[in-house]
């Protein structure tokens, strides 16, 4: 790791951290800002909640909106993408008899949220080697007269693809589209949310934007704002979107209050120049791993995320969830924080690049992988 950058975080130096995209990493300075926000509440709870919190939350919300390039009155703070998905499903009153289209590359909890409401999650299937038009066609074919919503990932979690969300939205009109943008804020340059033609867009801030966990931003198109309400009804009841999301009972708001500090850390670490540096590092690192495993480079098709990439594992490795879990345990025991993924009967290794990584991290992984895979050759 780049020791000078790693020291800004609290990461265990005994581990090689190559999975920043999963839960992010909070810089020490941001955690300290969150601690100060908590302490301010403890010193004078009544004043903090009644007098100071509303304006502070409005400022944090405005900072988050500006970071993803949307006006302050168009985006609410939520705790994570899962909450944002639940908010949209509830606000649209999705229920039994309804269908919601998800994709075979989508994060599973979106389908679970659909099913929890008694609706059917219909899967649009496309392959790792397909082209963007195959994604659009697959989603459009999955839409029926009972489809109430399409949920499509902007960057797919298991496969690190950047999906053509604008083209999907155009193809399925007038069906509303919710974009799961969990991996997007701070990681995908050139983003113009309002130009995508989608209805809802929700992205985590803790993954690539260095905020504390439990901070995400939910953007809603104008024609839906009157009907979108938080899952908890409390003191913000009756306020227009997005202020209606600010006060949902007595909860710990410190993650939201530290959002401006996390975004400041993103800029201080290099902003988009750092993302470009990480992307180039990841391409070289992934090639080191592919060379060590003797697996091919991916076919050019759907674009891949700047700071996430998957490497194909040899046949027979991590092809099932059980096999992937077994390999994960061996990797972690050897000091590597990198997730194997079982996807459509294939074993993949998802790599990430963050400011604290250097090329040595990937070279160490490449050197250690063959023996680790051999040690688990009899695993499921």
Task: List each model region and its residues.
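Conserved beta-loop-alpha segment that forms the PLP phosphate-binding cup at the N-terminus of a helix
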Residues: 51-65, 69-97, 108-111
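PLP-dependent aminotransferase-like
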Residues: 39, 47, 90-149
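Conserved PLP-binding catalytic core of the aspartate aminotransferase-like
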Residues: 279-283, 292-334
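Active-site phosphate-binding strand-loop segment of PLP-dependent enzymes
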Residues: 130-186
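PLP-dependent enzyme catalytic core of the Aspartate aminotransferase-like
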Residues: 5, 333-380
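A glycine-/small-polar-enriched, mobile loop at the entrance of the PLP active site in fold-type I
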Residues: 14-61, 68
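Active-site PLP attachment segment
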Residues: 195-236, 252
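Conserved PLP-dependent catalytic core of the aminotransferase class-I/II
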Residues: 59-63, 255, 260-298
């Amino acid at each position: 790791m780049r020791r000078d950058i790693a020291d800004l975080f609290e990461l265990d130096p005994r581990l090689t951290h190559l999975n920043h995209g999963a839960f992010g990493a909070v810089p020490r300075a941001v955690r300290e800002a969150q601690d100060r926000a908590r302490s301010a509440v403890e010193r004078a709870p009544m004043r903090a909640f009644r007098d100071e919190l509303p304006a502070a939350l409005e400022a944090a919300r405005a900072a988050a909106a500006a970071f993803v390039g949307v006006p302050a009155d168009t985006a609410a703070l939520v705790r994570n993408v899962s909450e944002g998905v639940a908010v949209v499903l509830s606000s649209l009153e999705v229920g039994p008899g309804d269908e919601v289209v998800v994709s075979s590359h989508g994060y599973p909890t979106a389908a679970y949220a659909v099913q929890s409401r008694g609706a059917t999650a219909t899967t649009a299937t496309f392959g790792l080697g397909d082209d963007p038009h195959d994604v659009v066609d697959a989603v459009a074919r999955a839409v029926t007269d009972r489809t109430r919503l399409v949920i499509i990932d902007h960057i797919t979690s298991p496969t690190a693809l950047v999906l053509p969300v604008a083209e999907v939205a155009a193809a399925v009109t007038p069906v509303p589209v919710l974009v799961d943008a969990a991996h997007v804020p701070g990681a995908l340059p050139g983003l113009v949310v309002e130009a995508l033609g989608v209805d809802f867009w929700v992205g985590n801030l803790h993954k690539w934007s260095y905020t504390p966990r439990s901070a995400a931003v939910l953007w809603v198109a104008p024609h839906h704002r009157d009907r979108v309400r938080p899952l908890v009804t409390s003191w913000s009841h009756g306020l227009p979107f997005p202020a209606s999301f600010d006060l949902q009972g007595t909860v710990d708001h410190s993650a939201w209050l530290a959002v401006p500090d996390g975004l400041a850390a993103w800029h201080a670490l290099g902003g988009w120049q750092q993302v470009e540096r990480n992307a180039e590092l990841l391409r070289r690192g992934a090639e080191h791993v592919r060379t060590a495993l003797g697996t091919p480079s991916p076919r050019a098709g759907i674009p891949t995320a700047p700071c996430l990439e998957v490497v194909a594992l040899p046949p027979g490795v991590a092809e099932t969830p059980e096999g992937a879990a077994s390999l994960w345990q061996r990797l972690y025991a050897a000091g590597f924080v990198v997730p194997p993924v079982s996807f459509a009967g294939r074993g993949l290794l998802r790599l990430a690049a963050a400011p604290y990584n250097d090329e040595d991290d990937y070279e160490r992984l490449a050197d250690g992988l063959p023996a680790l895979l051999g040690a688990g050759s009899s695993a499921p």
